[in-house]
Amino acid sequence: MVDLTDRQLFTPFTHPESGVTSYVLTRKVAPLQQGFYFVNESMSADGRYLWFYCAFPPSGTAHCGRTLGVMDFQTGEVRHYPETQFGEASPFVDGQTGNVYWQNGRGVWK
């Protein structure tokens, strides 16, 4: 189970007007890290892997300039995969295996 209060993994941010608290990954592998679009799962069913978008502004675009990163809660490791550049469609995480699938102009990848 993921412990959102673990400050080595997450930094809480409370919005000053709404009072809503969000938990942001403490360790960075990219200048911009963002969760998947809400219709796609970003975590494996066993809670081990949390996948997210990485971006390195000003390079790339939302059309084809983002790559993937993953937090491994078992090892505590956060990794960036620069070879995973994908198109506009959100990647898909297989909840059972933790594998991720993405597409770009050259095909569908795993």
Model-derived regions, located:
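Blade/loop signatures of beta-propeller domains
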Residues: 1-23
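Residue-level signal for well-ordered, solvent-exposed loop/turn and beta-edge residues enriched
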Residues: 20, 48, 76-77
